Amino acid sequence: MKKFALGVGIVALAIFSFLYIQLYRVQSTIDEQLAQQNIAVQSVNLSLFPPALSLKNIKTTQFSVQKLEAKLNFLPLFYGNAKLHSLNLQQITLNQNAQNSANISMDLAPFSLNQLLSQKVMLNGESHIRIEFDKPIYGNKTFNFTFKKANLDFSKSKSALIQFVDASLNNQPLGYIETHADFTSPRQQMVTYIKPQCDNDCLAILKYQQIDNQSAVNFSGKYFPVKRLFALLNLPEVLSGHADFNIDFTFLHSQLIQGKLNILAQNGEILGVNLLDMVSQYFPINYNGDLLQYKELNTRFEQFYLQLFLQQNQLIAEKIELKTPALLGQGKGIIDLHRMECNVDINLHSTDQRYQNLALPINFFGNCSSPQYKINFTKKFRHQLIDAIKEKLR
């Protein structure tokens, strides 16, 4: 029995010795990579139980990280091929002038530890990234990002190429994403192309530029799915269809100080509002069968144009223009981004030439996803309605 216990102890000691030798080799490889790429690190620590790697105060020409923690798979250590499956980065900033930092946690498809500090990293398999910023970006501090494949190329000291396949942000599918980054001091620029799966060719382009404490974002696109666009902008889901859009945001010390949005949605629906049903109660119009079949909970439209600007926690709709097969509309309103409440005034006209002078004023208020409404029966509207009825009876 003593011999058996002694044998087990010797085997266990041999295994642990072998594993620690493997860890020493891993650390030697990491130290070599850090030296080759001129990456400054305060300390590098490896542990066996649980298998993990920790680096403190990492500094490169492109970014800095206060602390990096990587969890390793245990079994691959026996073969001398350390693989990591999760990664945590604390207080990462893109350059010394950056006004915002982030904590990033990643659950990754297992990949070789040798790639962690290499200039080119390729990931294959479902991966999840959670990003939490120190300061909110457009009202959000936390972003959840997933993808199935990724290519990260940092082989050039002042630029980078990042590609994702089957990507999704905050549960919104974005498809293929490609980012070109320029870290030339003192200016920092990034251009990102987003190409989701669409019925027709659709594309969005995100441009970011930072100089000192100021930064600017331009987000534009063609035939982009409206629901995905509104979700990315943290706007209430009130429209469907596809949109051409151009959006400009200006930041100071990472705080959003100015925003302008122009969105032209086409061939979609206003969700949760049936304008045709509302109007049919007041307009002396006979709707044909083709129009009545769409009398459901939504309003089908051909075009919906929004011109908005950001004012503190509100989006001010300077101009709203609507075109449906039966109606034309013009209006303006306010969206409270904290409460997700809307207050919109819109005047509806018939597309019938005989009733162009009749404008039905409607006020929508309350929850943007299921608003209440009231008809503003002004003296002007009453006179217009009487004139329209007289015209119809002639």
Question: Each predicted region: which residue ranges?
Answer:
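Extended beta-solenoid/beta-helix repeat architectures
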Residues: 27, 31-32, 38, 102, ...
